[in-house]
Amino acid sequence: MSLYPAIVRAYAAFRELQLARVHRDPMSVQRRTLLRLVRRAADTAWGRQFDYASIRSVAEFQRRVPIQNYASMKPWWRRNFDGEADITWPGLPPWFAATSGTTSGDKYVPVTRELLRSHARVSADLLALYARRRPDRARRLFGGVFLGIGGTTTLERRGAVQVGDASGIAAGRVCWPLTRWYSPGRDIAAIVDWEERIGRIAERAAKQNVTFLAGIPSWVKVLLDRVLCGAVRSRNPEPGTRNP
């Protein structure tokens, strides 16, 4: 089934008008966005620490809130693991993304529902605007499946939160009707072992009409190598074997 109905074009036209206003005055948009986030977090432990409720400008925010790094934020975020809510953002972050970072070993960064909604909106904007500007190619793009290569969607419970790879957390939240176009599917995405998961993804992808591919470049290369190796073996079977 095609993903190219009139509603996609209508959404793209609407968002293009909105984004045009952003492009005309990006500094003003960023300023309003910062102050909106500050107001939202004003009643958290972090917001009270720096009196977010009284901040009215970017300059005031810069003067009052010191530049932070992971080491300075870690004690605050660790409180979420113990079930404390309203620490650096309203409520309790359901998930934490595990990342090795570049220094100091593993790091755990909160992932909120608002963050995932923002990522989903960006993805929708990307596809819709592409469809609006290149309708000829978009019909082919939306006529196949979207293959995402990321971490496992099986998360680990750590206290009051769940921990996993950021891409796995996002993939696990893909909802209907997008699931019908999402590959490799929930069954394979939930496999924890990397070698088994990438092998199963390659097997399934080789049989699908993949028109959209997303993932970490190094992981994408591994997948494509597996698909190519499978194709070579299929065309040149070992002596004594038959093609399936």
Give the predicted meaning of each segment.
Residues 1-98, 104-233, 244:
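Nucleotide 5′-phosphate-binding alpha/beta core
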Residues 237-241:
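Intrinsic disorder/low-complexity segments
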